[in-house]
Amino acid sequence: GNRLKPQRPGWLSILFQLQGVVTVDPDGKNAKGRWYGMGMEAKPTVSLHEGDLRQTWINGVYENEYVKEDGKWKIKKLHFNLTFRTPYEDGWLKVPVVGQNGPDPVVKPDAPSTSYAPYPSGYCVPVHFKHPVTGK
């Protein structure tokens, strides 16, 4: 039988993981991967015009961890560092999405957020690998 949960009405989320760099540990059982994420979403708004569908652009950086079990690679940790989420109509240069910046009402966070800014302020997500040219 199908064990997948039914989709939430009005939701669409397409997020591509692009330009990946995967580093396998010397033990051959663990790895880390860094990917850029770019995509689009459509979902009901949380507070503004409750229930209206809102289309957005979304962008960020993944820093993931993988583990090899029984000869198969599995995701150990999937971590997305949000750079921006903004209305499709306005583009990402104008405004962040108002009313969708809080926790998802369906998928609750496992811990409180430590900080939030609608756009990054020059922060660069730490890289897990050495620079391929300089080695630093």
Regions found by a protein language model. Give the residues of each.
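A solvent-exposed, acidic/Ser-Thr-rich amphipathic alpha-helical stretch
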Residues: 1-42
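Hydrophobic/aromatic beta-strand elements that line small-molecule binding cavities or substrate pockets
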Residues: 17-22, 61-67
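Hydrophobic-ligand binding "helix-grip"
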Residues: 26-28, 38-60
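Coil-to-beta-strand transition motifs
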Residues: 28-32, 57, 68-75
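Beta-strand elements of well-folded, non-transmembrane domains
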Residues: 37-41, 66-68, 82
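Glycine-rich loops and low-complexity Gly/Arg-rich segments
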Residues: 41, 57-62, 99-106
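Terminal "cap-and-tail" regions of soluble proteins that handle hydrophobic small molecules
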Residues: 49-53, 69-136
